Amino acid sequence: MEYIYASLLLHAAKKEISEENIKNVLSAAGITVDEVRLKAVAAALKEVNIDEILKTATAMPVAAVAAPAGQQTQQAAEKKEEKKEEEKKGPSEEEIGGGLSSLFG
């Protein structure tokens, strides 16, 4: 990811995205540069319009909207569990104990 970040930084600074410039940015950040990755990223970004990609990336819907639905489902499940526990209770321990004490009179 740091290679992409370096490329975006160069793009924002209006600098050429080249192997040398990416390497300089990564080295300045104290990152050990992998020459294979460096060449792959530089070659992949040569014919890419980064401005266009950034526009489409910001236009994509965010998935965070789905999170509240999950909370509602969890809350509903918790309420069902509480109802089941209340239904299962039956007679209390005192009621059961009172019936047994009459046996030993």
UniProtKB/Swiss-Prot annotation:
A molecular function GO annotation: structural constituent of ribosome
Protein name per UniProt: Large ribosomal subunit protein P1
Organism (species): Sulfolobus acidocaldarius (strain ATCC 33909 / DSM 639 / JCM 8929 / NBRC 15157 / NCIMB 11770)
Family: Belongs to the eukaryotic ribosomal protein P1/P2 family.
Ranges annotated as biased composition (Basic and acidic residues): 77-92
Gene: rpl12
Lineage: Archaea, Thermoproteota, Thermoprotei, Sulfolobales, Sulfolobaceae
Biased composition, class Low complexity, residue ranges: 65-76
An annotated GO cellular component: ribosome
Keywords annotated in UniProt: Ribonucleoprotein, Ribosomal protein
